[in-house]
Amino acid sequence: MTRVKRGYVARKRRNKILRANRSFRGTHSKLFRIANQQHMKALRYSYRDRACKKRDFRHLWITRINAVVRSYGLNYSRFMHQLRLGNMVLNRKVLSQLASLDPASFNRLIRAT
């Protein structure tokens, strides 16, 4: 069996990881072995946090809607229930934007429910 010298391929693989870690601090961007571990950990975090991001934004929207709706004497769950009874199909993102950017329209929406 012939000998395979991996100089070019190995260097290319290592440089790819080190380039990805360029913005990391200390040895996480300098030494390959530590940088590789940190790169794998960063990929795990990014995978996990893509799901968390959706959850966090939904939580933010609900909090914003609840804060505005309480000033009208309702709470979030009753408001959403009244929207469903009135066949008004608006998602939480749109309701949150409406509440913060256009309070007059949101006021009309609450009066309509």
From Swiss-Prot:
Pfam families: Ribosomal_L20 (PF00453). InterPro entries: Ribosomal_bL20, RIBOSOMAL_L20_CS, Ribosomal_protein_bL20_C. It is found in: Plastid, Chloroplast. The keyword RNA-binding applies. It comes from the Eukaryota. Coiled coil: none annotated. GO terms for biological process: ribosomal large subunit assembly; translation. Its main location: plastid. NCBIfam families: rplT_bact. Binds directly to 23S ribosomal RNA and is necessary for the in vitro assembly process of the 50S ribosomal subunit. It is not involved in the protein synthesizing functions of that subunit. Belongs to the bacterial ribosomal protein bL20 family. This is Large ribosomal subunit protein bL20c. The lineage of its organism: Eukaryota, Viridiplantae, Chlorophyta, Nephroselmidophyceae, Nephroselmidales. The gene is rpl20.
